């Protein structure tokens, strides 16, 4: 073993010496990339040593809160995610949850545990003990309720009224995500099965089987009543059989009620999980996806995923199980009236066939109605959000005419289908009535007894109901196609979250753009054309150029909103395409050109990217953004409500609140796209001086060139290429494109 260790040590020393070779002109970005390679290289040799020697490296979590990490691992195991070791630099609870849960798409939110919270279970919960503040995982167990691992006893304990007081009221609830790849019917079915517990399936199957077994008594009792009891003229026997039949009816009603409650619980469980997973998937989709659909249209399409899951549950558990078990009633038809079996089955099959033909014929109209409904929802939402613009232009009547045209088409499809579909119910009634007349005739000809006919009629009704349930399954299946097509854009688009992509823990602020080219559509010219740029940590860089030169597009590429067709972008030597984008964006403060505030109070708007920040930290960010005095003058200060359209505040206040939001988490990189266009020179100077104190990398896009005089570098773009690069004074002295742009602005002013 000592020989193996020595050989591995030599290899590691060689790799380090190899990394210490003089790098000449290469800057810090190349050094960082080399360091990343060396870390991976060293880890590979350490893994070989572990495999050969049978040892295990000491955990990087030494000194961390073992209980907290252990609780998070138990939650990961519950969601069938393999736990991984945490870097020593990840120390806070928020950072640990981000590092471990984010790459797997697991969602979380803060909740309050009210009295009796343990009686039902939806997802795993992370809580804390009152005595020592240590973290504890609450894991769903059985048909309802939670269990937790007691470190003292070393056993899993069920939470109940006696021990719920041991835990703090504040906790974090977690939700299971959809698979991170493309969603299919199979993956949705697997998601539903994994969301439900074994007890959910067992209880539903048992209750359905019990309801069917009780139902089998109906034909038997009818035969006994109309035969033996009536022939005997025994009053006591009549009373006894009557009481028994009433008891059977009540039992059947109770069992079906229990089944309905179980199904309602399952549907609620599925609905909560699916809605949370759908929202998380929508929020995780690439930015360019949202260009294709309006907000209302996308909202409607997201709801169809929930509809699809409800259909799957109904087919598999509710209608499906009932239909299968109810087929046992066929044996009773053979028992009481063999001569009527085939005519009865013929009528049932004819009704079933007619129902299926009608359903599949209606599919294309259902799809059309869904599409029109989604389109109408999108237009309605756009009209409501843009009502101020509509009124300013006096276009109320024109907008109503556009909406009513779309709505009328939707009504036309819904209320004026072909004659065959409109007369569907009448045709079905004719088939059923004709079948009953035929069976009455055959019963008379076959001389079926009264008692046997009553029993047959009861069994026939149950068999007919079973086949109609099968028809309803076919109807539901027929609706799968239009429903899937409506939800297909969300299901097919792969989220930005990808399992295995590393979470960004820290940023130094170094950025490298290497030979990047980008166009929005094939066949169009490049907006960014073979652009290369290196930005050192802490640099203050301005990007300028005429309208359409690619400034905002470059910013979108840096944020991962667009993917380059060629080249790569690196942060601290790490390729943007290979890292978790959300964790990167959380380390960057951004104010986009058309940025908006969210509906809510000012405090919520400032801390939205860092919910753990306190009110004092929000005030500090507002001071740096030069908006604190304005907030103090507002009716409720930091808790003043802002409407969706940012009503009640000026454009300058809106921009400064967005700047406060960007700088509140103290990011290492700040990107501003025309973020101070509505500010006067004095306020802009306050903001600029405050940003200087952050000691972070700043990338600014500005049309007002007087605001970038203090920049370390100014990049002039033209047709997606860098044509000039230097300080303000250097570019003015060159007398090139930038100097011409400055001169034009002076003349305009």
Where do the model's predicted regions map?
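Transmembrane-helix motif of ABC transporter permease domains
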Residues: 198-218, 224-272, 280, 291, ...
């Amino acid at each position: 073993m000592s020989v193996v260790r020595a050989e591995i040590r030599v290899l590691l020393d060689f790799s380090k010496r190899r990394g210490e070779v003089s790098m000449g002109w290469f800057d810090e970005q190349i050094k960082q990339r080399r360091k990343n390679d060396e870390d991976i290289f060293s880890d590979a040799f350490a893994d070989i040593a572990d495999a050969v020697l049978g040892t295990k490296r000491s955990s990087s979590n030494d000194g961390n809160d073992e209980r907290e990490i252990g609780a998070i691992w138990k939650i990961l195991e519950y969601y069938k995610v393999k736990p991984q070791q945490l870097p020593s630099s990840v120390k806070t609870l928020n950072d640990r949850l981000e590092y471990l849960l984010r790459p797997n798409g697991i969602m979380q939110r803060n909740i309050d545990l009210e009295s009796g919270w343990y009686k039902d279970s939806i997802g795993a919960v992370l809580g804390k003990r009152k005595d020592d503040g240590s973290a504890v995982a609450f894991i769903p167990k059985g048909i309802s309720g939670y269990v937790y691992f007691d470190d003292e006893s070393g056993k899993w304990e069920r939470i109940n009224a006696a021990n719920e007081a041991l835990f703090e009221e504040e906790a974090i609830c977690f939700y299971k995500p959809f698979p991170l790849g493309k969603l299919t019917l199979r993956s949705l079915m697997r998601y539903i099965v994994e969301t439900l517990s074994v007890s959910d399936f067992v209880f539903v199957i048992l209750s359905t089987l019990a309801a069917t077994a009780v139902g089998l008594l109906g034909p038997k009792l009818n035969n006994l009543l109309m035969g033996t009891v009536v022939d005997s003229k025994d009053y006591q026997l009549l009373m006894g059989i009557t009481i028994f039949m009433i008891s059977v009816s009540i039992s059947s009603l109770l069992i079906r009620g229990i089944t309905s409650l179980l199904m309602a619980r399952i549907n609620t469980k599925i609905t909560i999980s699916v809605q949370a997973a759908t929202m998380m998937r929508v929020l995780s989709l690439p930015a360019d996806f949202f260009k294709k659909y309006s907000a209302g249209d996308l909202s409607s399409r997201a709801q169809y995923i929930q509809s699809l899951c409800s259909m799957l549950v109904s087919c598999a558990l509710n209608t499906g199980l009932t239909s299968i078990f109810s087929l046992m009633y066929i044996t009773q038809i053979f028992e009481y009236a063999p001569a009527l079996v085939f005519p009865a089955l013929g009528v049932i099959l004819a009704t079933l066939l007619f129902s299926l033909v009608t359903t599949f014929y209606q599919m294309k109209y259902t799809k059309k109605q869904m599409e029109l409904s989604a389109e109408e929802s999108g237009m309605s939402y756009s009209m409501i959000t843009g009502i101020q613009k509509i009124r300013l232009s006096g276009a109320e009547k024109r907008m109503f005419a556009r909406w009513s045209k779309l709505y009328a088409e939707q009504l036309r499809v819904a209320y004026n289908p072909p004659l065959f579909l409109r007369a569907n119910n009448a045709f079905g009634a004719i088939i059923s009535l004709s079948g009953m007349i035929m069976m009455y005739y055959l019963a008379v000809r076959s001389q079926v007894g009264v008692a046997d006919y009553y029993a047959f009629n009861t069994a026939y009704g149950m068999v007919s109901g079973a086949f109609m349930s099968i028809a309803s399954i076919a109807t539901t299946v027929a609706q799968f196609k239009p429903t899937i097509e409506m939800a297909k854009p969300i299901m097919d688009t792969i989220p930005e979250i990808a399992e295995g992509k590393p979470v960004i823990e820290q940023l130094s602020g170094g950025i490298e753009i290497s030979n990047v080219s980008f166009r929005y559509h094939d066949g169009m010219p490049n907006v960014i054309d073979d652009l290369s740029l290196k930005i050192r940590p802490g640099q203050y860089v301005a990007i300028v150029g005429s309208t359409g030169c690619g400034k905002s597009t470059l910013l979108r590429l840096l944020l991962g909103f667009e993917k380059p067709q060629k080249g790569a972008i690196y942060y601290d030597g790490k390729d943007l395409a290979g890292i978790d984008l959300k964790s990167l964006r959380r380390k960057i403060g951004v104010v986009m050109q058309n940025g908006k505030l969210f509906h809510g109070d000012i405090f919520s708007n400032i801390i939205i990217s860092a919910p753990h920040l306190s009110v004092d930290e929000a005030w500090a960010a507002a001071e740096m953004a030069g908006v604190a005095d304005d907030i103090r003058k507002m009716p409720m200060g930091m808790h003043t409500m802002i409407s969706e359209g940012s009503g009640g505040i000026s454009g300058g206040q809106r921009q400064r609140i967005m700047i406060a939001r960007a700088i509140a988490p103290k990011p290492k990189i700040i990107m501003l796209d025309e973020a101070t266009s509505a500010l006067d020179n004095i306020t802009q100077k306050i903001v600029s001086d405050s940003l200087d104190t952050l000691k972070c990398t700043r990338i600014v896009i500005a049309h007002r060139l007087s605001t970038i005089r203090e920049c370390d570098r100014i990049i002039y773009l033209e047709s997606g290429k860098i044509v000039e690069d230097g300080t303000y004074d250097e570019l003015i002295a060159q007398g090139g494109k930038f100097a011409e742009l400055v001169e034009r602005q002076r003349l305009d002013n």
